[in-house]
Amino acid sequence: DGAVDALVHTARRTGFRGRWEQVSENPRVICDIGHNEHGLKYNFTQLKRMLESGEISKLIVLYGSVADKDVDAAVRLFPDNATYIFTRAQGKRAMPAEEVRGKYLALCAEDGRPVAQTYCCETVADAGRLAYQLVESCEKAGALPADVLIYVGGSTYVVSEFLAIKA
């Protein structure tokens, strides 16, 4: 289909990065700059399907947002069976990681959802290091690196900082 082809090849054609971009295979790392409810709904639906199908056994979400986005709507879309690392990008518009975590915990309490394992990191670099440490812990517990997925998203700024660290 033409739309799928356009999305898949956008990065190569334009140099534009961060749209469902797999930046690593072992462990698998996918970055996506989707930051509104529509984009995040698509992303989190894909991640839920990957977990449910057994394509991955462990999901680690590295997530940050800017303060003017509807984080309450975003956290409603989060998969229940993931580990969350909340972070903030550099810049004045970034929402503090603890505030994003607080919104997630409030939603869980309000909706009776199970609370996932959560962490907060003040920088994207620290969040990235923690994500890779969690992958190592999964491997020590018997998971294969290909069974673990790190998803980086919530903000163009978070993805950009992560990609700069990976470069």
Listing of model-derived features with the role each one plays in the protein:
Residues 47-51, 131, 135-139, 166:
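Short, hydrophobic alpha-helical segments
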